[in-house]
């Protein structure tokens, strides 16, 4: 039973983590002739300082100007067969079907007419050219089944923001999950001969440009010519910054991201740790039975069995145990599928496809070979003479080596757990510069005329303390432009949020210098702007060149609007009272009950308006959900590996006390106390555990440091905390040894000696 539990746990986690790695390595390879797909990327760098800006954790920005895709197809018709313009940034509005708001899980993209042909996605119903109409919508097969059942989806209507009808004109085959362009439905990106939110060349760079070539080698030709092509349409230098365009195969984007590489390396370490700890534990348990099973091996050899027969017998035994473990593993995965899918952010049906099924099969084969070959070889080489005498070879070297690997693995995983627990706690409890308790928010583009009335009606409600509107959510990137220094050179990216005068009070922003806004174009700047501008004499009263006719009336404490994934941004709040996108409401207690009452009031009073309020705390949790999932993955892995190691350690101690029972009895006859016996066994374990624990903790420290590099704000990794973790692991090991050996240490030595 112990062997089955050990292998089942190791097999479960190993299969899931290694399959996740294979899944991510298959990103963007789900399309026909995926090697012919390319994506445009931008490289912004300062010609004087060499400073660069990127959105992939490195130096490249994959969001570019809307016309680039069409220009590629027009200027390079020989190489580029099709090119498509995609917007995922502003695609996800509030969509309703039969007056029910679609879940946030329903993903949407804004695409042009060439989207399906470029990617090779089959269109099952409808004409993709209908996407030229701005109110057109295509849905996936699964979306059509979920919402329309057996009815024909063509002509069905979804309502955007409860005011714009979006008509279903077609159905396409589901897009697999291993792509950045997964969409349950797509809407047209076209508008009045241009692109929604585009603003042409040099305008809004929020679009992906993906193209298909005739041959994979043509991507390099496009790369050689794209810069010259763009320079035909717009200047690529401005204020000392240079824009350079290049292209890469789409399939390499995800794999070459530094964040992806780090994540997969960590998954690999975790999977390797628990998988091999489980195998080592199985070997340890099997080898521990050597003394008891030697005689039966000798009997088999006396009856004509050779080494090969004995080896086959033990491989057969391992095969049966592995088969049972596979069944237990399948049972665990099937019954915990919801938890697993949440932790890995992928459906099991996508994780285990025909293309990736080789991963679990390879894991099972490796498990069988590694767990069976070594024990089988050891048992097959037991001399036939052992049938006549007791086999006393304890294989101590093997056992200690196996224990060393197990202790290293468990200390590594627990050390990594320490890092994830501390960082997640740091992210969720760190001061964001706003007061999130009781703060709720809703976003929707509304007619400016109705906003004052809605604001007043919300303010009058008994559950509401205060309300303010703004152009942007308090969390996320605002409208941006270059922040210039006194020498006219760019010193940062300015985030601009247009807000009501009482906005700072509502969201809990602290003004540390000056006064609140009271007039249009009054400006509040954050501490980061003061630092970058080097205003040592104060900022109040100064004009702000980036905002025409604006005057700074105060300085507020820094707000981490882009979370702690990003460095602190320079922010300016621009005062006014005519903003129609984001409603910020400060609720009275009890918050959860009053949030429910507020949303009920909105549905009843303003049924034509798509405003659903959510807590800012929930928005933060959503931002950090990947950290939360990773933390839980490490937590579960830690629990599994600790259980496996404890089972193996108990088996080892049990075997050692039985094998050395006569030695222990003789020591007691010669005056040794129980404490002396326990000290003997504990020291024997510590000889192995101390160096292995320290090795595992050191590995965890460096892997944890690599994982933390994705955050601009990192928890301090105090070495003393890692030493404390090592001490806890050592205490657990010693406790297991003492508890298991307590009986034999206190047993009457006569009971052990009389059997001789």
What is each residue range found by the language model?
Residues 1, 31-32, 227-273, 291-292, ...:
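Membrane-helix entry/capping segments
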Residues 1-24, 260-295, 323, 327, ...:
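Hydrophobic alpha-helical transmembrane segments of multi-pass inner-membrane transport and secretion
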Residues 2, 280-321, 381-392, 647-688, ...:
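Intracellular coupling helices
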Residues 15-19, 231-232, 318-381, 422, ...:
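Small-residue-rich transmembrane alpha-helices
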Residues 17-93, 198, 202-212, 216-225, ...:
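Membrane-proximal extracellular/periplasmic loop immediately following the first transmembrane helix
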Residues 24, 40-42, 72, 116, ...:
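Generic structural signal for small/hydrophobic residues in well-ordered secondary structure
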Residues 25-34, 48, 54, 184-194, ...:
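Short juxtamembrane loops and helix-capping segments at transmembrane helix boundaries
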Residues 111-125, 137-259, 456, 460-623:
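Mid-to-C-terminal secondary-structure elements
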């Amino acid at each position: 039973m112990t062997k089955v539990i050990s292998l089942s746990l190791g097999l479960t986690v190993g299969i899931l983590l290694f399959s996740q790695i294979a899944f991510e390595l298959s990103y963007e390879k789900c399309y026909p002739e995926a090697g012919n797909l390319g994506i445009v990327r931008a490289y912004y760098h300062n010609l004087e300082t060499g400073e660069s800006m990127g959105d992939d954790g490195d130096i490249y920005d994959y969001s570019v100007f809307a016309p680039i895709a069409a220009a590629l197809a027009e200027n390079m018709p020989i190489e580029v067969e099709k090119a498509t313009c995609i917007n995922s940034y502003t695609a996800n509005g509030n969509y309703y079907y039969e007056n029910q708001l679609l879940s946030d899980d329903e993903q949407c993209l804004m695409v042009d007419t060439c989207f399906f042909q470029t990617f090779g996605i089959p269109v099952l119903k409808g004409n993709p050219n209908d996407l030229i109409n701005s109110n057109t919508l295509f849905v996936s097969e699964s979306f059509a089944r979920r919402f329309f059942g057996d009815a024909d989806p063509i002509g069905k209507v979804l309502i955007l923001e409860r005011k714009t009808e979006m008509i279903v004109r077609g159905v396409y085959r589901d897009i697999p999950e291993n792509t950045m362009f997964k969409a349950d439905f797509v809407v047209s990106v076209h508008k009045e001969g241009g692109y929604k939110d585009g603003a042409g060349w040099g305008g809004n760079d929020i679009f992906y440009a993906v193209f298909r070539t005739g041959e994979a080698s043509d991507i390099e030709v496009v790369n050689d010519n794209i810069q010259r092509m763009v320079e035909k349409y717009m200047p690529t230098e401005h204020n000392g910054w240079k824009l350079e365009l290049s292209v890469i195969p789409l399939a390499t984007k995800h794999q070459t991201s530094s964040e992806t590489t780090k994540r997969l390396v960590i998954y690999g370490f975790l999977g390797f740790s628990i998988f091999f700890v489980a195998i080592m534990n199985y070997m340890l348990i099997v080898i521990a039975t050597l003394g008891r099973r030697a005689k039966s091996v000798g009997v088999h050899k006396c009856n004509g069995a050779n080494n090969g027969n004995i080896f086959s017998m033990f491989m057969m035994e391992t095969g049966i145990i592995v088969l049972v473990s596979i069944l237990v593993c399948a049972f665990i995965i099937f019954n915990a599928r919801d938890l697993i899918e949440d932790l890995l952010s992928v459906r099991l049906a996508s994780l285990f496809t025909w293309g990736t099924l080789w991963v679990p099969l390879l894991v099972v084969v490796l498990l069988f070979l590694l767990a069976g070959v070594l024990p089988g070889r050891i048992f097959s080489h037991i001399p036939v003479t052992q049938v006549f005498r007791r086999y006393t070879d304890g294989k101590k070297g093997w056992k200690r080596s196996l224990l060393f690997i197990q202790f290293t693995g468990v200390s590594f995983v627990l050390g990594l757990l320490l890092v994830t627990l501390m960082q997640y706690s740091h992210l969720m409890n760190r001061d964001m510069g706003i007061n999130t308790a009781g703060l709720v928010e809703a976003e929707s583009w509304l007619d400016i005329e109705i906003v004052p009335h809605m604001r007043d009606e919300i303010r009058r409600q008994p559950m509401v303390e205060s309300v303010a509107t703004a152009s942007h959510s308090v969390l996320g990137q605002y409208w941006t432009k270059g922040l210039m220094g006194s020498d006219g050179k760019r010193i940062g990216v300015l985030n601009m949020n247009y807000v009501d005068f009482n906005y700072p009070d509502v969201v809990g922003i602290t003004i540390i210098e000056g006064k609140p806004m009271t007039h249009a174009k009054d400006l509040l700047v954050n501490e980061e702007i003061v630092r970058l501008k080097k205003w040592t004499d104060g900022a109040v009263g100064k004009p702000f060149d980036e905002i025409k006719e604006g005057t700074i009336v105060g300085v507020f404490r820094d707000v981490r609007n882009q979370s702690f994934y990003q460095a602190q941004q320079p922010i300016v709040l621009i005062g006014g009272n005519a903003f129609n996108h984001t409603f910020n409401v400060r609720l009275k207690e009890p918050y959860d009950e009053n949030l429910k009452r507020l949303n009920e009031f909105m549905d009843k009073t303003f049924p034509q308006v798509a405003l659903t309020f959510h807590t800012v705390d929930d928005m933060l949790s959503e931002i950090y959900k990947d950290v939360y999932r990773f933390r839980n993955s490490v937590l579960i892995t830690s629990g599994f590996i600790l259980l496996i190691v404890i089972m193996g350690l108990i088996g080892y101690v049990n075997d050692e006390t039985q094998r050395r029972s006569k030695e222990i009895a003789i020591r007691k006859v010669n005056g040794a106390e129980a404490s002396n016996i326990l000290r003997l066994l504990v020291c024997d374990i510590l000889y192995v555990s101390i160096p292995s624990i320290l090795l595992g903790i050191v590995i965890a420290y460096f892997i944890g440091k690599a994982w933390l590099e994705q955050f601009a704000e990192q928890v301090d990794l105090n070495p003393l905390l890692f030493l404390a973790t090592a001490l806890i692991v050592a205490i657990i090991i010693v406790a297991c040894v003492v508890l298991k050996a307590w009986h034999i240490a206190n047993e009457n030595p006569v009971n052990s000696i009389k059997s001789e």
